[in-house]
Regions:
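Short, small-residue-biased leader/transition segments that mark boundaries at the very start
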Residues: 1-2, 222
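Gly/Ser-rich "nucleophile elbow"/oxyanion-hole loop immediately N-terminal to the catalytic nucleophile
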Residues: 4-12, 20-42, 58
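Accessory cap/linker subdomain of secreted extracellular hydrolases
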Residues: 7-11, 73-220
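Short glycine-enriched nucleophile-adjacent loop
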Residues: 45-56, 62
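Active-site nucleophile loop of the alpha/beta-hydrolase fold
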Residues: 63-72
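Extracytoplasmic/secreted cell-surface and envelope-processing proteins
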Residues: 48-49, 71-74
Length: 223
């Protein structure tokens, strides 16, 4: 069963807002708009794609950037990354310091996989970095990871898995993307990351039927 808020998020709100916006513009300017254009990215990109399919006469031109056309798959990938990098109580297992260490180690290993040393990884798919190589003996204070931290990084690289360890998504984070995890997946100072907050609200009020509401927590999620 779909609720009105889910239908609105899925397609209705963009169309109704467009119709209302055109009416407001016509009332204010005394003439209907001659042309209407839409541009959006991510969810906005999906909105543009849906508009083109469901309401093709709403706009004369649509630019859809990075459209999220697989809401379920995208949500699972983001949830997996956030959960992997936090403990059951929601505390981050790594911070920006450790992720900078990991990123530097990845660049050091894989920068030359395209034959050019430029601080960039030419083909992240060819980078087989293992974060467990950064695990140091207990008490070492160099740029080291704990076993649990290395497991967390490896889990994000591997992508969502079921209870038997089988991949359930083609999407995952490549080695070299670690700096993008900062604030998006984990955040310093005990604050929730961007996607921790985003995924919490989506799974509470959008992704299930019926919605579990405020009792749902990322730490209790089972992928």
């Amino acid at each position: 069963m779909l609720f009105r808020s889910e239908v609105d998020f899925g397609f209705r709100a963009t169309h109704v807002t467009t119709v209302a916006g055109k009416a407001i513009a016509a009332a204010f300017y005394g003439a209907a708009p001659r042309r209407a254009y839409f541009t959006g990215c991510s969810t906005g990109g999906r909105q543009g794609m849906v508009e083109a399919q469901r309401f093709p006469y709403d706009f004369d031109g649509i630019v859809s950037g990075a459209p999220v056309v697989d809401e379920t798959g995208d949500a699972v990938v983001l949830l997996w990354a956030v959960k992997s990098l936090h403990d059951a109580n929601g505390s981050a297992l790594l911070g920006s310091r450790e992720l900078n260490w990991v990123h530097a180690a990845v660049i050091a290993q894989c920068d030359m996989n395209d034959g050019v040393r430029d601080g960039l990884i030419g083909d992240p798919r060819a980078c087989t970095f293992d974060p467990h190589a950064m695990v140091c003996p207990r008490g070492a204070d160099a740029q080291c990871l704990t076993e649990r931290q290395a497991n967390a990084v490896a889990a994000v690289y591997a992508g969502p898995r079921d209870s038997k360890g089988r991949s359930i998504s083609v999407a995952h984070a490549f080695p070299g993307s670690e700096l993008n995890w900062i604030n998006n997946y984990v955040r310093d100072g005990g604050l929730p990351s961007i996607y921790a907050g985003f995924m919490t609200e989506m799974f509470r009020y959008l992704n299930f039927s019926p919605d579990p509401g405020p009792s749902w927590q990322i730490g209790r999620a089972h992928v």
